[in-house]
From Swiss-Prot:
Catalytic reactions on record: alpha-D-glucosamine 1-phosphate + acetyl-CoA = N-acetyl-alpha-D-glucosamine 1-phosphate + CoA + H(+); N-acetyl-alpha-D-glucosamine 1-phosphate + UTP + H(+) = UDP-N-acetyl-alpha-D-glucosamine + diphosphate
UniProt-annotated catalytic positions: H366
Gene: glmU
Listed transmembrane segments: none
Organism whose genome encodes this protein: Caldicellulosiruptor saccharolyticus (strain ATCC 43494 / DSM 8903 / Tp8T 6331)
PANTHER family named in the record: BIFUNCTIONAL PROTEIN GLMU, NUCLEOTIDYL TRANSFERASE
Protein name listed in UniProt: Bifunctional protein GlmU
Subcellular location: Cytoplasm
GO molecular function, one term: UDP-N-acetylglucosamine diphosphorylase activity
Gene Ontology cellular-component annotations: cytoplasm; membrane
Highest taxon of the lineage: Bacteria
Length: 463
């Protein structure tokens, strides 16, 4: 049987510096809860990995974000230190695990390649533990790595306990560990809380292992962004700005043109085709996919939507919708959830669409509400058309078949069907089905009252 890995993610902290009623690890970075960055990275790269999340304060927030994910939970009722958190998770470790990784839910950008290097180095050196180190030009506040001439880690000295000479050391401990499972079990039984905080520190494991003749080795991270901890609103801001630029640069390298990488927000899970142009002030969020040769923005907001090739979306909001090729939207249009625009559709300014399908080459140029509708191909919806879908108790659907023409300022009272090639005269309120090829007129006949203005004027002058 192949050996597996267990990943313990510590997420029980109070997060006081974040000043939030929500758990720190569910705070969003580029629209994605930070703990999901770690979960996704593990799931994509460690097929047999078991994930154990240690929760404590505000645990319901973490449960909600991870609902439906293949993770196990361990509960740390009292926060008694990092080693204590790991102790709480030990019952969830798989029996056939060889490597046990300890990670942090508020250090979200660690990469799978770095974790694999920890495992590889530990095995090559037959070590009990391989820990990750980083080199910081300003190491203030971090524990310093004390190593021998062969690079073996002897201990970690915290900032408050370090001598002046030790404080000059720039190699620090960001807190990522890869233990051999049985060695972790053994060392946890030897860690005590005889310190000023009465807590169980996982860093004590290093000296305990060394005293037992066990080997402790290290790997230095190549990109310090991977070990960036996020504890405050400012650190959340800094992390988001850096991640935003990295995401945008990656899209640039793949052939996407981003006019201003500083004012464009692209979710890490979004996909964009080459030769698409993104203008400033645009937000592309969630699992959105955008095809090639599109023009998006400026000032567009797109979330969890699928957009085809050669689409233009200007100053508009798109939510949970699908847009096929060669569609033009905006300015100031709003596609609400479950909308489908087939190829060649044109949607103009101040058009709102909700839970509706528009067939090929259908047009709605301006000032229209389309709710709960099934609209065919080559339909023209005149300015001011309203699909009246709600009777005060429930929603009803409207059907408009191919090649129909809806005149301006018309109301279609659902449920109603407009037949193929039918015309609805401008200003009509339609309450009954319109047959194919028919003209529907539902308005008061015009009456011209000759001389009325002069008579009215004379009446007021004679008062």
């Amino acid at each position: 049987m192949s050996k597996k890995s267990t990943f313990i993610i510590l997420a029980a902290g109070e997060g006081k510096r974040m000043k939030s009623k929500y758990s720190k690890v569910v705070q969003k970075i580029m629209g994605k809860p930070m703990i999901l960055y770690i979960i996704d990275e593990i799931e994509k790269n460690f097929e047999d990995g078991r994930i154990v999340v240690v929760v404590g304060n505000k645990k319901e927030d973490v449960y909600k974000v991870l609902e439906g994910r293949n993770v196990r939970f361990a509960y740390q009722e009292k926060q008694l230190g990092t080693a204590h958190a790991v102790m709480c998770a030990m019952s969830e470790i798989s029996d056939d695990s060889e490597d046990v990784f300890v990670l942090y839910g508020d250090v979200p950008f660690i990469k799978a390649d770095t974790l694999k290097k920890l495992s590889q180095k530990r095995k090559e050196e037959a070590a009990a533990l391989c820990l990750l180190t980083a080199i910081f030009e300003n190491p203030y506040g971090y524990g310093r790595i004390i190593a021998d001439e062969n690079g073996n880690v002897l201990k970690i000295v915290e900032e408050r306990d370090a001598t002046e000479e030790q404080r000059k050391i720039k190699k620090i401990n960001p807190g990522f560990y890869c233990f051999e499972k049985q060695e972790l079990v053994n060392v946890l039984s030897k860690i005590d809380n005889k310190n000023s905080q009465n807590e169980y520190y996982l860093t004590d494991a290093i000296e305990i292992l060394n005293r037992s003749g066990k080997k402790v080795v290290k790997v230095t991270v190549e990109d310090n962004f991977e070990v960036m901890g996020i504890n405050s609103r400012y650190e959340l801001f800094v992390a988001e700005q850096e991640l935003k630029l990295r995401i945008n640069k990656e899209h640039l390298s793949k052939g996407v043109q981003i006019i201003d990488i500083y004012s464009t927000y692209i979710h890490p899970d979004a996909q964009i085709g080459k030769d698409t142009v993104i203008y400033p002030g645009t937000f592309i969020l969630g699992k959105t996919s955008i095809g090639e040769d599109c023009v998006i923005g400026p000032q567009s907001y797109i979330v969890d939507s699928k957009i085809g090739n050669n689409c233009h979306i200007l100053f508009s909001v798109i939510e949970n919708s699908e847009i096929k090729d060669n569609v033009k939207i905006g300015p100031y249009a709003h596609l609400r959830p479950n909308s489908l625009l087939e190829e060649g559709v044109k949607i103009g300014n101040f058009v709102e669409i909700k839970n509706s399908k528009l067939g090929k080459n259908t047009k709605s140029a301006h000032l229209t509400y389309i709710g709960d509708a099934d609209i065919g191909e080559n339909v023209n919806l005149g300015c001011g058309t309203i699909f009246v879908n709600y009777d005060g108790y429930k929603k009803h659907r409207t059907v408009v078949e191919n090649n129909a023409f809806i005149g301006c300022n018309s109301n279609l009272i659902a449920p109603v069907k407009i037949g193929e090639n039918a015309y609805v005269a401008a200003g009509s309120t339609i309450t009954e089905d319109v047959p194919a090829n028919a003209l529907a007129i539902a308005r008061e006949r015009q009456t011209n009252k000759e001389g009325w203005v002069l008579r009215r004027k004379q009446m007021y002058e004679n008062r």
